[in-house]
Curated annotation (Swiss-Prot):
Enzyme class: hydrolase
Organism of derivation: Sulfolobus acidocaldarius (strain ATCC 33909 / DSM 639 / JCM 8929 / NBRC 15157 / NCIMB 11770)
GO biological process: trehalose catabolic process
Protein name: Trehalase 2
GO MF assignments: alpha,alpha-trehalase activity
UniProt KW keywords: Carbohydrate metabolism, Glycosidase, Hydrolase
Amino acid sequence: MNYALLSNGITTALEKEGSIEWFPVPKFDSPSVFTKILDEDKGGYFLITPEKFNKVKQQYVEYSLILRTEFDDGNLILIDFLPLSLPAIIRLYEAKVPFNVEVKPLFNYGLVNAGTETRKDGIIYKNPESKEGLELLINGDYKIISPYRITVNSGKGYLYLLYSRDLRYGLFSQKGFVYSEPYEAYSKLLYYSRKELERARKPSIYENAFYRSLSVILGLIYKPSGGIIASPTTSIPEIVGDERNWDYRYVWVRDSSYAIEALVKANLLTHARRALDFLTNLLDPSSKSFDHPFYSVDGTPPPAEENLDWLSGFMNSKPVRIGNAAYLQIQMDIEGAYMNALYEYYKRTLDKDYISSIFWAVEAISDWVSSSWRGESTDIWEERGISRHYTHTKLMSWVALDRASKLAKDLGYNKLFEEWKSRANEIKIDILNNGVKDNHHFVRYYGGDEIDAALLTLPIYDFIPATDTLFMNTLKKIDEELRVADGLYLRYKKDFMGLAKNPFTLVTTWMARVYIRLKEFDRARWLLETLIKCNQDLGLIGEHVDPETCEARGNYPHLFPHSGMVLSILEFDEVR
């Protein structure tokens, strides 16, 4: 799956070899108008290719999310990007040969055919069921064969496709002059991308993987709110032909907290602060701190899950789902994820004024965790219909109170410090008494025999030293039972849908971070290099990977492994 990600912090697109096959508008979690990635025949696409070609080379411009596609050693060169602040696609071209353009938008995930209107300078594609539409402005020596096919002669020019909720304010309206000139938009985006990454810490190893992962994290931040989505796609299957197809275009408290840690460690503190503020504003002091595991990009509750039965699915993997029913789950680990991210931000900035201003959130979470940690819940892996006393969930309750106690101590709240520290110790004792099998190794849930990869986070969150015998035994079992290829691991053996098959890429970065703590640096580097080799040509990592082909599986690219890559690389620098 060698798709390139294009993003401007408003929406995203996925492109492969000149064909844009995913484009939700106007924002990350909106219905798509190009959906070919989920249905070869009915999905819709925006294709630019020469009449004939033998080879295609794709690469990003520097560490931006601007894509350069070259056909046959320069016969046709495309520069594709989403301009800042607009739900639009700009495609600059330089051609030595004539080429073809095919534009086939279908509104509402391929369900609604577009009405068309040909203009002197381009084409309008209207949604007959609303005021929205797309407008294609064409620059160069071209001929419109039909509303869906254009031929362009050699030379330089561009194609500018803009989405409008109301076509009265689009490119061809009297207000069209306000939209960016394409070449200027390119320069602005490249300058902006450079400036963002210039602020980041410079790593001593794996520079390409580091900056590409950072650019992906930044590309998944919804700029109007600061929320960070887990992935730009829906229903890319974990296993081809299976039903493990989910919509990840939402802001998971857990995933975004992990990304905040990566941003903090990378010194991109403004983005980290905005993402923290987004999560803080979702807190409910009167109930469970986060009443949903994830939210829409504007902070509203996510939509209910539904199947799009008219789409055949990625490689015929049905169903295609939008929305996500996991939003109804009670997940008791997420408060700890947030608290750890907040604490990491504080450690980096020592900004007591900021922590004081949101200490109500620290208290609300600590009170809720203190009164609720003994209950059962769904775990980090979001198994449907199953609640247990998961060891990782208890760990994150410990993390919440441990970090809260440290913040309270630094702010001079000594009584709260003692109270929360005592409760954290109580949880720790409970885990050591109930989350361990035969005094030998940790288990996935109390009273069970299974292990899972989330147990790798025990030393990462400083619950227990990586050298502790209990953990070393656990590490050995994970390596023996969950490893399916060199450096690649399942997150668990089975779930409510059956046996797991494809490795979960985040686990490789967890493993690397564990071996860094064990000072086995060669092993840690080998693990990261294994994942880097599977990163596709463009350096993007999916949620899963096929252990035989190294091809990405699951939603793509995914926030978790890119955050883990950044954290792993920077932790190398801290111990060297």
